[in-house]
């Protein structure tokens, strides 16, 4: 079923192999009168919340409707790259800290902290190992990257996966909040493969 769903989506032109790298975005929060944001050549290094470009070279931009088909079929790995809130260093002694959960698209893997423009060596290792594991070493496994509407974290993470040789990278700019706005379900999640 999963292989058939991928073949169907490829033949319908919903995956990278069936379309040029330019895509279209559904549920954009950028006003129609705003000038489109140009795709930079490098990573976004700061001010991660803000209008994003409508494209990502080498990736297929997917709409909510397209992602729903992928999600229901299980044909792609959904990767939420929203950063994880860190324990404040100045908490008063004796304060109990509980790592917050995140609500994202059910079945997603939350790869926290991999969408920054510059990654620590530890974050690079975590990201590479996680992609290797979730793709089962198949560089053509469909990988969908998202975080929130108008957030560069997913754009950066998807760009990095492309640079590492992943060939079926999909980018979902509306993020978990765009998914929720479409009245689709969210589920609580914790970071994938991290010690909490």
Predicted regions and their residues:
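Glycine-rich nucleotide phosphate-binding loop and flanking beta-alpha elements
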Residues: 85
């Amino acid at each position: 079923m999963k292989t058939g769903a991928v073949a169907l989506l490829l033949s319908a032109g919903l995956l990278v192999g069936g379309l040029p790298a330019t895509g279209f975005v559904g549920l954009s929060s950028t006003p129609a009168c705003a000038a489109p944001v140009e795709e930079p050549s490098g990573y976004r290094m700061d001010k991660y919340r803000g209008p994003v470009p409508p494209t990502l070279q080498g990736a297929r931009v997917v709409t909510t409707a397209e992602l729903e088909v992928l999600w229901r079929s299980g044909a792609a790995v959904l990767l939420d790259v929203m950063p994880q809130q860190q324990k404040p260093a100045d908490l008063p002694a004796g304060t109990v800290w509980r790592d917050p959960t995140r609500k994202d698209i059910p079945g997603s893997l939350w790869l926290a902290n991999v969408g920054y423009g510059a990654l620590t060596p530890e974050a690079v290792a975590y990201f590479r190992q996680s992609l290797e594991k979730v793709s089962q070493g198949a560089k053509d496994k469909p990988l969908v990257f998202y975080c929130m509407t108008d957030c560069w974290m997913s754009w950066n993470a998807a760009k990095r996966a492309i640079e590492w040789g992943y060939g079926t990278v999909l980018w979902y700019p509306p993020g978990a909040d765009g998914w929720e706005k479409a009245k689709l379900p969210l589920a609580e999640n914790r970071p994938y493969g991290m010690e909490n």
